[in-house]
Amino acid sequence: CLLILGLVLEQLQVEGKSCCRSTLGRNCYNLCRARGAQKLCAGVCRCKISSGLSCPKGFPKLALESNSDEPDTIEYCNLGCRSSVCDYMVNAAADDEEMKLYVENCADACVSFCNGDAGLPSLDAY
């Protein structure tokens, strides 16, 4: 779980910058990149890939409109992350204690990921 989120975050930093019009587009792109190709995810989520230092006009990287659906979007991102990544870890755990630890750390990573916290501490710490 944490490795997957770490790889997604690392890909976002190494590859071209993804520029999205909204938080919904940003979350869509981030979740899609867990399995999808950069160009595919950008197209599906209506984002653009920029190799420059800034995003094209109309595609702010993480800017939100004042009346955006940010809380709902973040909640859906958290639910999607937890159900697709953290639930998988339940089956991988050897015992109840290990499962509890995995799920707790995974849930924390999902919250940070969905809130756009690019300054995550090293995921190896989990």
From Swiss-Prot:
GO BP terms: defense response
Signal sequence region: 1-16
Disulfide bonds: C19-C55, C20-C47, C28-C45, C32-C41
Subcellular location as annotated: Secreted
InterPro entries, per database record: Thionin, Thionin-like_sf
Keyword Protein biosynthesis: no
Pfam families found in the cross-reference section: Thionin
Keywords recorded for this protein, A-Z: Disulfide bond, Plant defense, Secreted, Signal, Toxin
Family according to the record: Belongs to the plant thionin (TC 1.C.44) family. 4 C-C subfamily.
Stated name of the protein: Alpha-1-purothionin
Species this protein is from: Triticum aestivum
